[in-house]
């Protein structure tokens, strides 16, 4: 039976499969930092070519030299654009467990998310719960802050993070059904947009949008769409024994200045960075949606 097949071919992975989010989680850490009022996109934060996890001999490094910064520091915007592991690991530790986990919870982590349609669509279902670890030591907090360790998400959760940034910090209730029509095509019911929480301020959302646009303009130009401003964050989560494989991610929305679509894409068990594994899929989805 397909339902018992090891690859789980009929599993709804958007709502029922957890993946490490990799660097897409840096958007959550950035939101937590911006909300304190002590950070701006141009704020210089500690970075460097390597960072030793507190209390260990394990070192984090970066994928590209631009992520190291200069003289041990990098701007928040460049840290996100070049996906600086050393910067965001240190930023997460500096903010502390409570600040990062609180922002994650405001964005839907650690709570089941009900996917609803309307009164006429049958029984709603509940997604599996995305998780950010709490009450952890700084070494684990550093890893969790770059979307590794015990941080796990559903694709739905990551799409909701992107949508919250696009919606001025408002986390929206996900729904599959826009409206229900009768046999004569008259509208029986229509789903109304519902705000689940105000995760962060519109000012923070605007600054995050600016930073996510820089992800495209400064580092991932392959994700650019002609005539459209695109805001994204890529992710390359290491998985498997010895971290030998990758879950490639990209989350984002467009147009950045007037959002119409928010997307999360994950490609499991590949050997490509998220920008190249998931990026073309996101780009095609955005182009198709914006062409309608």
Regions found by a protein language model. Give the residues of each.
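Hydrophobic alpha-helical membrane-association signature
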Residues: 157, 278-281
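Intrinsic structural disorder
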Residues: 219, 257, 271, 283-292
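A short acidic/glycine-rich loop-to-helix N-cap element
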Residues: 267-279
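Short, gly/Ser/Thr-rich active-site loops of penicillin-recognizing serine hydrolases
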Residues: 186-194, 280-292
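Beta-lactam-recognizing serine transpeptidase/beta-lactamase-like catalytic domain environment
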Residues: 1-22, 28-267
């Amino acid at each position: 039976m397909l339902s018992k097949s090891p690859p789980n071919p009929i599993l709804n992975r958007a709502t029922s499969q957890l993946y490490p989010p990799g660097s897409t989680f840096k958007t959550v850490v950035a939101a937590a930092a911006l909300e304190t009022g002590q950070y701006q996109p141009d704020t210089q934060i500690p970075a460097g070519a390597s960072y030793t996890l507190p209390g260990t001999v394990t070192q984090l490094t970066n994928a590209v030299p631009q992520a190291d910064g200069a003289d041990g520091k990098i701007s928040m915007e460049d840290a996100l654009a070049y996906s600086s592991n050393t910067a965001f690991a240190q930023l997460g530790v500096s903010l502390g467990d409570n600040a990062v986990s609180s922002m994650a919870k405001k964005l839907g982590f650690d709570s089941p998310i009900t996917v609803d349609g309307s009164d006429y669509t049958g029984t709603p279902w509940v997604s599996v719960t995305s998780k950010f670890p709490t009450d952890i030591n700084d070494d684990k907090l550093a890893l969790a802050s770059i979307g590794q360790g015990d941080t796990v998400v559903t694709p739905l959760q990551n799409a909701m993070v992107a949508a919250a940034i696009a919606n001025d910090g408002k986390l929206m209730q996900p729904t599959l059904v826009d409206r229900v029509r009768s046999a004569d095509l008259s509208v029986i019911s229509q789903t109304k947009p519902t705000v689940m929480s105000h995760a962060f301020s519109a000012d923070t959302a605007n600054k995050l949008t600016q930073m996510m646009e820089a992800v495209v303009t400064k580092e991932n130009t392959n994700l650019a769409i002609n005539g459209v401003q695109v805001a994204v964050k890529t992710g390359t989560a290491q998985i498997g024994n010895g971290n030998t494989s990758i879950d490639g991610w990209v989350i984002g929305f467009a147009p950045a200045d007037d959002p119409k679509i928010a997307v999360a894409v994950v490609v499991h068990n590949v050997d490509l960075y998220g920008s190249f594994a998931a990026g073309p899929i996101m780009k095609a989805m955005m182009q198709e949606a914006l062409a309608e």
